[in-house]
Regions:
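N-terminal cap/lid segment of alpha/beta-hydrolase-fold proteins
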Residues: 1-38
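Short beta-strand/loop motif that positions the catalytic acidic residue
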Residues: 183, 189-191
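Catalytic active-site module of serine/aspartate enzymes centered on a nucleophile-bearing elbow/loop
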Residues: 221-222, 227-255
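Serine-hydrolase catalytic machinery in alpha/beta-hydrolase-like enzymes
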Residues: 40-133
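Acidic catalytic loop of the alpha/beta-hydrolase fold
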Residues: 193-198, 225-226
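Catalytic histidine neighborhood in serine/cysteine hydrolases
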Residues: 203-204, 208-226
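Primarily recognizes the serine-hydrolase "nucleophile elbow" in alpha/beta-hydrolase
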Residues: 118-182
Length: 255
């Protein structure tokens, strides 16, 4: 990993763009940090870092104010990364089905999501290796947002992640429900009740499948982009509980 640019934002947060091989990413660290700080991995939809930047930097600033470093990486096939023909075809099939008012088949969902999970999760793990080697970044580590299936796989295979905040707003292959049953870390799940592109019952079934002793579902009225401001405050409180180590207190257990 090497840094390609850096700037101090107006609130003092240090923003550094980096490259991990062909994978672009961004790291944000608090201005006031005098010791290694906990890290939150910021998931994002496959729309590209540049398009998602305003939302990502807002999340990063909010987290920095709570004493967390945050980082994100460009997903495979997104942004400036090479196109991925199979996934592009699946996206076209998805748009065609939704425009026609037809149910989205399991085959389309599998073709859209499963290859992304298989490729993105090892990339996230490689990024985590590199980020935790930096003197200013320490543990514990949390994961927040993005494609929920990527978060599920990461929570299953990556022991350094001790807590996760998921957004139940994307299609989930049936195979991921089995993986969800293996998750035991604390979870904070956000659901937009009127999300036009999300199967509400499937989201509730997925929440039920999580095997975590501590899991909370935060449902708000409104569509996919209508997440209220206070929802971010609740997620911040969740990570403060589980990533800020206090004397005599353990971080979230993996079971």
């Amino acid at each position: 990993m090497h840094f390609t640019s850096q700037q101090h934002l107006d609130d003092g947060v240090l923003e550094r763009e980096f490259a991990l091989g062909e994978i672009p990413g961004i790291l944000w660290t608090p201005a006031s940090a005098s010791a290694p700080v906990p890290l939150i991995l910021l998931g994002q939809p496959p729309l590209g870092l540049r398009k998602m930047y305003p939302r990502l930097v807002a999340r990063a600033r909010h987290s920095a104010a709570e004493g967390f470093a945050t980082a994100t990486i460009e997903l495979p096939g997104s942004g400036a990364r090479p196109r991925w023909p199979a996934v592009e075809q699946a996206r076209a099939d998805l748009r065609r089905a939704m425009d026609a008012g037809e149910p989205v088949s399991d085959e389309i969902i599998d073709a859209l999501i499963l290859p992304l999970v298989e490729k993105a999760v090892p990339e996230w793990q490689a990024a985590l290796d590199a980020l935790l080697s930096l003197p200013e970044v320490g543990g514990p580590v949390g994961y927040s947002g993005g494609v929920i299936s990527i978060g599920i796989r990461l929570a299953v295979v990556e022991p350094r992640i001790v807590a996760a905040s998921f957004f139940a707003g994307s299609f989930v292959p049936r195979a991921m429900f089995e993986e969800a049953r293996q998750i035991t870390i604390p979870l904070h799940v956000l659901l937009q009740w009127d999300d036009e592109g999300n199967d509400r019952q499937a989201a509730l079934d997925l929440f039920d499948a999580f095997n975590s002793k501590e899991k909370s579902l935060h449902a708000n009225m409104g569509g996919h982009t209508g997440v209220p401001q206070f929802a971010g405050d609740a997620a911040a409180q969740f990570f403060t509980r589980h990533l800020k180590v206090r004397p005599g207190r353990q971080t979230g257990s993996r079971g």
